[in-house]
Amino acid sequence: MHELVLSGRFVLNGEIVGGSIGIDNGLITEISRRDIKGEEVIAFKSEIILPGLIDTHVHLRDFEQKEKETVESGTKAALHGGITAVFDMPNTKPPIMDVKTFEKRLSILEKHAYSDYAASFLLAGNCGEASRARADFYKIFMGASTGGIFSENFESDYSCAPGIVSVHAEDPETIRENPERPPEAEIRAIKKALTAAEKLRKPLNVCHVSTVGGIEAIIKKNLPWVSFEVTPHHLFLTSKDFERNPLLKVYPPLRSEEHRKALWENFSRIPIIASDHAPHTIEDKEAGAAGIPGLETEVALLLDAANRGLITVFDIVEKMHDNPVRFFGIKGRDFSLGNEATFTIIDPKKEWKVKPEEFYTKAKWSPWEGKKLKGKVVMTVIRGMVVMEGDEIIEEPKGVRLDVQGGNH
C-alpha cells in the first residue's frame, strides 16, 4: 500500500490515460492503468495530472526590491499558477555578479522558496567570479535591460561560462539609435549569438524570441546545443495592445501582428514557453518600467488556447516540462518510476475570470485582467506534498534547488 495515490487521467508517453500513480517518500513508485491502494487516495474526475511544469525565466526580485517581489511571494505565485520550479534571474539589485552575492541569494532561496528553483549568475566581464560561483545557469544581457548591466563582449563572456547560458538578445547599438527597440535589435543580436554558438559549440538558450527574423535565424541554423524561449505575452499580445495600455511596456517589446503570427506559425518548433515574469510596483510601471507579471496566467492562457484548438495539452507538457528537463539536464524530474512525484493538476474545462487582486505576486495587475479563460490549474504537488489546492497555498516553504546537470545536446 502506497503512502499516497493520485488516481484519474494523466499524460503518459504522449497520450492521456486513466489509472493511478503510487507515491512513497516523495517519489513515484508505481504507474498503473488500474486502481491501486494507498493510505491516502486523491481521486480526480475531470482533471488531468501533468508532470510538474517548469518556468525557465522568472524575476523574483527580492534583495533591495522587496516592494516589487520577494522569493516568497514569487514562488507562491508560481505554485498558484501550476509552476513547480522557477529559474531565478540574476539582474537583481544588487546584481548577482560575485560569489558573496550569489551565496546570499542561495541562502534566501533555501529559506523562503515555496517552489523548487534554479540559481543563476550574471555574466558581464566577471569570468573569474563566475568560475567560483557554481550556478545552475548563467545569464548574459547583450543590450541594456532592467538593471542596466550588459556584456561588453558577448563571445568572451559566453566562452568562459561554466554552464548553460541564457541570453537576452538585443543589440545595444541599435537600441541607442532607436530606444523603441525595433525588431532589428533582436535579429542582429540573435545572429551574433548564433555565430558565437556555432563557433564555441556551447549550450545556449535564447530568451523571449519575439520576431520573424529571430525565430527564422535560430531554426535555419538548427544547432542542437541552442534552445530558445517564447513568452505568452508575445504569443497573445501585439503592439496595438501596448498602444491601448502603456503598462504593457516590456523588453523585447510587443510586436506587430506579423511577428505574432510568425510565432504561431512556428509554434511546433518552439522548444520552451517561459513567462519572463517581471513584476514591478504600479508606480514604477507608470514611470516606464519594463516587464509583465506572468506566473499566475501562463498555464491558463495555454489551456485556453488548447480549448480553442490552437494547441494541445501535449504541447504544454513538451514546452514547459519535457524540453526544459532535457535541455538543462534536470535530474529526477522525468515522469517515471523512482523520480520525484511532482505534478501540475489542471481542469481543462474549468472557466474562470482573471482577478489580479487575488494573485500571490506583489504585482497586482495583469494584461488579462477581467478576461474569461477556459482551463485552470487546480492543484500543485511537489515530491508527494499537495502545496497548492483551489487557489490556496497549503504548505510551508519547502522548495529545493534543482539538480541541473547541463543537459544533453
Swiss-Prot record:
Catalytic activity line of the entry: (S)-dihydroorotate + H2O = N-carbamoyl-L-aspartate + H(+)
Keywords per UniProt: Hydrolase, Metal-binding, Pyrimidine biosynthesis, Zinc
PROSITE patterns for the chain: DIHYDROOROTASE_2
Record carries keyword Zinc: yes
Binding site for Zn(2+) 1: 57, 59, 139, 276
InterPro entries named among the record's database cross-references: Amidohydro-rel (IPR006680), DHOase (IPR004722), DHOase/Allantoinase_Hydrolase (IPR050138), Dihydroorotase_CS (IPR002195), Metal-dep_hydrolase_composite (IPR011059), Metal_Hydrolase (IPR032466)
Annotated metabolic or biological route of this protein: Pyrimidine metabolism; UMP biosynthesis via de novo pathway; (S)-dihydroorotate from bicarbonate: step 3/3
Cofactor(s) listed: Zn(2+)
Residues reported to bind substrate: 59-61, 91, 280, 290-291
Modified residues (N6-carboxylysine): 139
Protein name, UniProt field: Dihydroorotase
Native organism taxonomy: Archaea, Methanobacteriati, Methanobacteriota, Thermococci, Thermococcales
